[in-house]
Amino acid sequence: MIKVGIIGATGYVGVELLRLLLNHSQIEIGAISSVSFDGQELNNIYKNFLGRTNLICTNMNEVIEKSDVIFTALPHGLSEDIAKKIIENNKICIDMGADFRLSNEEEYKYWYGNNFSQPELHKQSTYGLPELNKEKIKNSSLIANPGCYPTSIELALAPLLKNSLIEPNGIICDSKSGTTGSGRSLSLNTHFPEENENFAPYKIGEHRHTPEIEEILSNIANTKVTVTFTPHLLPINRGIISTIYCTPKEKIGLNSIHKIYTSFYENEQFVKVLPLGEIASIKNVRLSNNCHISFHLNHRKDQIIIISAIDNMIKGAAGQAIQNMNIILGFKENEGLNLISPAF
């Protein structure tokens, strides 16, 4: 049985990973660690695990020693050195943070304020968006799990950019997320009286997911792609919906667009291209690893509008990481991820 460990197990992403992994039939949990709750039993931190596990938060070295696959669910800047140790021990590392998502060190320094601490390791890392990078993921031992916003946007735009059907510049990405995307640490923006009955953008023009979106979309299009990305906080726990505006190079109808998308994703079980006339929504993907995509035309402005919906904690984080693990280990891609969204 494959042993799996989590470094940073008590943040929202880490604990969501653990919740899903406990229902995975092909693995068992080797060990978990948490700086904030070192030495404490998980059941005393999160009561929803009562009766399911007696795991105790231990130190990072024990997690690496007892695990074959290690998920690092840490703030940016903390994973590189740990990943090096994991790889040196011939283990698999799936990093949930931003440390390995960008290939350009100058770009990383501009957005995150640091240089790469392990530049050679970046050459070994693979961007873990399975629907677009599956073959590389299969043979990788270091995965950069994509950001939540980039996942929703990249899946939505990939078919059009891959087929050179839209202008690569001037793409507008208007995204809304539940507050779990901000993590478990307290902040004024996610304080209940501030967020409840409110809806507002944040980090306008300076969100750190912007360079990730542009780099991956540029790779898909084989030309430089630029976007205007504006995130917003919704007064809900989980979910992302992205509304994306782009300009076709030539006039194209909805039926043609639908055929392109259904063909592009025909073998991808987690991406659902909705029938024409339907609109993607958070409710229908909540608590699942699915991405729902719908598209629409603004005939007056000759504009394609794409709607993409995911659960930010699952397809945007923990579920996608498990999907990557399944691919690397040769498991069924949906192992542990056969999740159906609740109807209400």
UniProtKB/Swiss-Prot annotation:
UniProt cross-references to InterPro entries, sorted A to Z: AGPR_AS (IPR023013), AGPR_type-1 (IPR000706), NAD(P)-bd_dom_sf (IPR036291), NAGSA_dehydrogenase (IPR050085), Semialdehyde_DH_NAD-bd (IPR000534)
Keywords: Amino-acid biosynthesis, Arginine biosynthesis, Cytoplasm, NADP, Oxidoreductase
GO cellular component: cytoplasm
Entry annotation: catalytic residues: 148
Chief site of localization: cytoplasm
Gene Ontology biological-process annotations: L-arginine biosynthetic process
Entry EC no(s): 1.2.1.38
GO molecular-function term, one example from the UniProt record: NAD binding
The protein's annotated pathway: Amino-acid biosynthesis; L-arginine biosynthesis; N(2)-acetyl-L-ornithine from L-glutamate: step 3/4
SMART domains cross-referenced by the UniProt entry: Semialdhyde_dh (SM00859)
Catalytic reaction equation(s): N-acetyl-L-glutamate 5-semialdehyde + phosphate + NADP(+) = N-acetyl-L-glutamyl 5-phosphate + NADPH + H(+)
Compartmental location: Cytoplasm
Similarity annotation: Belongs to the NAGSA dehydrogenase family. Type 1 subfamily.
Protein purpose: Catalyzes the NADPH-dependent reduction of N-acetyl-5-glutamyl phosphate to yield N-acetyl-L-glutamate 5-semialdehyde.
Name this protein carries in UniProt: N-acetyl-gamma-glutamyl-phosphate reductase
Species: Clostridium botulinum (strain Eklund 17B / Type B)
High-level lineage: Bacteria, Bacillati, Bacillota, Clostridia, Eubacteriales
Gene name tied to this protein: argC
